[in-house]
Amino acid sequence: MENTLKTLYNNKICKDLQKKFRYKNIHQIPKLVKITINRGLGEAANNKQVLEKSMNEIAAITGQKPKITKSKKAIAGFKIRENIAIGLVVTLRRDKMYDFLNKLINLALPRIRDFRGISYKTFDGRGNYNLGLKEQIIFPEIKYDNVDKIRGLDITIVTTAKNDEEGLTLLKEFGMPFM
């Protein structure tokens, strides 16, 4: 089954970007490289159930088992010891990346309360976009009754764009609802 966003990129977006930015070579056209989903769980140091529930939530959202990130050094102020699980990360590529982006644009973002669009100011200067979500219940796979605590997650969309303008145009073409 061909992915709709991937087909859209190959058939329409490439041509539009090539016209707009006047690329001489098709390899200059920006494309998506990967999407990284990250969740920091400081409270997981004390409560292992938090880590398990978050792993299940992120696996349901992304369709891929998350990798546990561990602390590199002890920080007394945060009550964290070295080598303790404090977060989860998933890197999506190829078809899963396009599936997740489609779900994010068409299902999750419109479910945010008082949603008017996402900010275009969180590009990093190299065409990569960062998005922070405050609650995981906007995804259709997460049932509100099964959630013990509202936790957010960070999403990074990595592109081959040379600058923010190219990255913004690429994501707008995919249908990202910028304000």
Curated annotation (Swiss-Prot):
Family recorded in the similarity comment: Belongs to the universal ribosomal protein uL5 family.
* InterPro entries in UniProt: Ribosomal_uL5 (IPR002132), Ribosomal_uL5_bac-type (IPR020930), Ribosomal_uL5_C (IPR031309), Ribosomal_uL5_dom_sf (IPR022803), Ribosomal_uL5_N (IPR031310)
Q: Which HAMAP family match?
A: Ribosomal_uL5_B (MF_01333_B)
Q: Which compartments does it reside in? A: Plastid, Chloroplast
Q: Which Gene3D superfamilies match?
A: 3.30.1440.10
> Where is this protein chiefly located?
plastid
- Protein name listed in UniProt: Large ribosomal subunit protein uL5c
Cellular component aspect of the GO annotation: chloroplast; ribonucleoprotein complex; ribosome
Taxonomic lineage of this organism? Eukaryota, Rhodophyta, Florideophyceae, Rhodymeniophycidae, Gracilariales
NCBIfam families linked: PRK00010.1
Which Pfam families does the protein's record reference? Ribosomal_L5, Ribosomal_L5_C
